[in-house]
Amino acid sequence: MTGVQTCALPISPPEHLIRFFPIAGTPVETLIGDTRRQVRRILDGSDDRLLVVIGPCSIHDPAAAMAYARQLLEQRHKYRDTLEIVMRVYFEKPRTTVGWKGLINDPYLDETFRIDEGLRIARQLLIDINRLGLPAGSEFLDVISPQYLGDLISWGAIGARTTESQVHRELASGLSAPIGFKNGTDGNIRIATDAIQAAAGGHHFLSVHKNGQVAIVQTNGNRNCHVILRGGKTPNYDAQNVAAACEQLTASKLPATLMVDCSHANSSKQHEKQLDVARSVADQIASGSNQVFGVMVESHLHAGAQKFTPGRDNAAALEYGKSITDACLGWEHSTQLLELLSRAVAQRNAG
């Protein structure tokens, strides 16, 4: 690039990392396949449980993530008849301007940007979480990292800032996991319904093969995609907004079911309000509604968030088990939320 200084450092191709951390023929592969099938059944209504994707806003400390996973596994077992619990394991953070972009981009929180190490740490952590018997869900922010990690994800999301991107719609069309598209940051549902329709079709596009070579990828389409309501200029989780969104889905000839994100604009960026969102969703479910098939929740061992700037702050001084990105519910409130949702599902299904 003329007049611009750039530097490109090659890293190992995806197949090298997959060979080093294999899952073929293991219980991890079985769990992921089974969970994907269960999520598809929840999507099509043949499983009447609620999908709950819950976990830290982002992963910055693998040890804390594993501690959280062990506690969440107990909740997964406890509510297995009413909830399909999947741990939120986000390694990449979209940024409106600048900031820490996640564990893959800067795994050591020191602006060394060891992306090769970030991919290795992420793959190891995903395997460790799945080995517990706890499936993982994540956001797909770029089109290369899924080649390194996609086989370990049971459910995926395309964020509000990328739902309208053709590249991400093409990516979703080739992923094996069910994928949720968030409404736009302004609350626009149409871009999400358009994305679902686009991802359902086959595409040809440039990407990277698992051997590291640039390739033309042909996909058959992913028909297991859905809308995630995350709020916009105002929250959109209440029964009236859910019904309006389902009308738009029906008008687009799509299934009239969706997921609600309890965080982000729906909680007005106030983590405690996630409980209020969950109560509203629980009331809708308890009244007999099947329109909301799942929820997303930002949760960690400890409530809130702590400020951290890579290159300026000391990572060793961070409080254990607390987010360094969006504020999260603490563990006690997280278990209350799960119990609330479980009771609502049980009440609906008993009726």
Regions found by a protein language model. Give the residues of each.
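Conserved phosphate/anionic-ligand binding catalytic regions in large, soluble enzymes, centered on
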Residues: 51-64, 326
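Gly-rich Lys/Arg/Thr-decorated short loops/hinges at beta-loop-alpha junctions or inter-strand turns
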Residues: 14-23, 219-231, 318-319
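Conserved, mostly hydrophobic/aromatic
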Residues: 55, 260, 330
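Active-site-facing alpha/beta catalytic cores
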Residues: 82-237, 241-242, 264-265, 269, ...
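Glycine-rich loop at the start of a catalytic domain that most often binds anionic cofactors/ligands
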Residues: 62-74, 97-104
